[in-house]
């Protein structure tokens, strides 16, 4: 039968702005950079919260697409006894495709640096990295969350910022030292 099982009741719920891309955009803008955000949000309160936060931080949101009948990507983090667990719902992030990038290309090609991370589809990340490389636009790849990426196009990124766990996922047959020396 249907029973609610729990070890303990929760105490608090906090809702905060976020997403790796949005956090990086806000941080760069607060440091004085001129920032344009490219991506997708859902047709919901979370999407509106993200859009409002970006605008409040003077980020150009002209290339953020609101996807009808779709939820905004979210991450739900539970913390119990010092241990966290994260449930990620891709939502509209899964809709960031080549057409979204192409629509924003006039802004992208003018950028001093394009920042991308693994919370959008891998084929889209590959497209961005390859096109930026071809057109001499610097690209920084934050390979989080950790996943296996094709080293053929991965090496085309100008900068890669993995943590130790992500580094071992990208280069599973090499030690950290071997990878850094390569």
Where are these regions (language model features)?
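Glycine-rich phosphate/adenosyl-contacting loop at the front of the ribokinase-like
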Residues: 1-40, 45-59
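Structural alpha-helical scaffold elements that stabilize or flank donor/cofactor-binding regions
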Residues: 4, 106-107, 153
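Beta-strand->loop->alpha-helix junctions that form or flank phosphate-binding loops
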Residues: 11-14, 38-43, 61-72, 142-144, ...
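Conserved phosphate-binding/catalytic loop of the ribokinase/pfkB sugar-kinase fold
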Residues: 40, 66-67, 77-113, 118
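Short beta->alpha connector loops
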Residues: 44, 119-123, 143-147
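Short gly/ser/thr-rich secondary-structure transition/capping motifs
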Residues: 58, 94-99, 139-145
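Conserved phosphate/ATP/ADP-binding segment of small-molecule kinases
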Residues: 129-182
């Amino acid at each position: 039968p249907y029973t609610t099982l729990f070890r303990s009741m929760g105490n608090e719920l906090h809702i905060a702005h976020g997403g790796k891309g949005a956090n990086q955009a806000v941080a760069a803008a607060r440091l004085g950079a001129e920032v344009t955000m490219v991506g997708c949000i859902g047709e919901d309160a979370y999407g509106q919260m993200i859009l409002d936060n970006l605008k409040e931080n003077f980020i150009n949101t002209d290339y953020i697409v609101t996807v009808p009948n779709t939820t905004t990507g979210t991450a739900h983090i539970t913390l119990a006894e010092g241990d966290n667990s994260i449930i990620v719902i891709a939502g509209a992030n899964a809709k960031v495709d080549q057409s979204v990038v192409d629509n924003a290309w006039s802004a992208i090609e003018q950028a001093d640096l394009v920042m991308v991370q693994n919370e959008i589809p891998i084929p889209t990340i590959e497209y961005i990295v390859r096109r930026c490389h071809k057109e001499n636009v610097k690209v920084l790849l934050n390979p989080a969350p950790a996943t296996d990426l094709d080293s053929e196009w991965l090496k085309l990124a100008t900068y890669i910022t993995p943590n130790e766990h992500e580094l071992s996922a990208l280069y599973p047959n090499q030690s950290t030292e071997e990878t850094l020396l390569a």
